[in-house]
Amino acid sequence: MNFSDITFLPKPVQKPYPPIWIGGQSKPAIRRAAQIGDCWHPVGAIPAAPLEPEELAENLVLLHQYAEKAGRDPAAIQVSVKAPLYDAGDSSGPRRRFSGSSDEVRQDVQTYSDVGVTHLIFDFRTGDPKQTEDRMARFSEEVMAVT
């Protein structure tokens, strides 16, 4: 789209424009991301729960097919996943992705990377700013520093 007689400030740092991220995991959203997006960010019916790697891999096949059909290089489209970071909590049931020990979280990061995810957006928020800051520091020291 082009607009005339419009001023937009501040100008974006990225050239020629900021990357366009397309969200959603429906087929139309995946097709849109493949046709015009720089990054696909699947957001499903339960935004707090990321797609499992197997389902994400299936959707990436579709994304790549749509990109090729649109004449685009599928490798040029990045993939982002929101990764809610959970405290270990109750270990009697199945472990949620991005919860548990630092080793388990690192393995989750690697699993999503292996599927094709290029960006993970971690959610460190809690009701207490100090606790949020502590979670970020712990993640930085125990997960990022080793990954």
Q: Where are the regions a protein language model picked out?
A:
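Active-site-adjacent structural elements that line small-molecule/cofactor binding pockets in enzymes
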Residues: 1-147
